Regions:
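N-terminal FAD-binding dinucleotide-binding subdomain shared by FAD-dependent oxidases/monooxygenases
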Residues: 1-6, 21, 34, 39-41, ...
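A short, basic/flexible loop-to-alpha-helix module at the beginning of a structural domain
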Residues: 13-26
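Short coil/turn connectors at secondary-structure junctions
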Residues: 26-27, 50
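Extreme N-terminal leader/targeting segments of oxidoreductases
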Residues: 2-16
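Beta1/beta-strand and adjacent pyrophosphate-binding region of the FAD-binding site
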Residues: 27-35
């Protein structure tokens, strides 16, 4: 996860189950990670930060929280879950370019979150899908040569927030975590 060449001179936080209670007020923050872990952290960080740049390593399907019992959700057919996720993405992200960057392949996992797309659309939030070339003293340099200057880098890789694997016949395990609207981990 942090095996990028180069050295960053600012603050580096590694996701280890923390809720965004760190001080991000007025800061330029980079969040590097997969869609599920980023979905959990982005709303809390964006509420404080002046600018947030999300470096997405992998997209995941995002479905809104449904007022349905967990056993019913666990038995939902993969095709139905994928259809709900696609409709959620289309409904919440009108910009076709951004939507294409947020669309995972059909084997991607699914995270439950109510505000990820809404937060990502805020003017001070930006999605970057170019691969990272290296860390620089003042930020993150992507392979397109752009150096994104930030004060803090948060590495957000945590597969525990992938709650289901689509198209592989997996069921939501009873111990799986779901990501809530406030970014809190909740039992399935």
């Amino acid at each position: 996860m942090t095996a990028f060449p180069g050295t960053f001179a600012g603050r580096v936080l590694r996701y280890a189950g923390f809720a965004p209670r760190h001080e991000f007020t007025g800061a330029r923050v980079a969040i590097i990670g997969s869609g599920a872990a980023v979905a959990r952290l982005l709303p809390g960080i964006a509420a404080e930060a002046a600018k947030v740049t999300v470096f997405q390593t992998d997209a995941v399907w995002i479905v809104p929280r449904a007022p349905l019992p967990a056993p019913l959700l666990r038995r939902a057919p993969d095709r139905l879950v994928r259809s709900v996720a696609r409709a959620n993405l289309r409904f919440q992200v009108r910009d076709s370019w951004l939507r294409s960057r947020l669309t995972p392949d059909d084997t991607a996992g699914v995270a439950v979150h109510d505000s990820y797309y809404r937060t990502l659309r805020q003017p001070h939030c930006r999605l970057v899908t170019w691969p990272i070339a290296r860390l620089a003293p003042l930020g993150v340099r992507t392979v397109d040569g752009i150096e994104h200057r930030v004060d803090t880098i948060v590495f957000a890789e945590d597969s525990r927030h992938i709650v289901r694997t689509i198209a592989r016949g997996a069921r939501l395990p009873a111990t799986a975590a779901r990501v809530g609207a406030a970014g809190r981990k909740e039992p399935a």
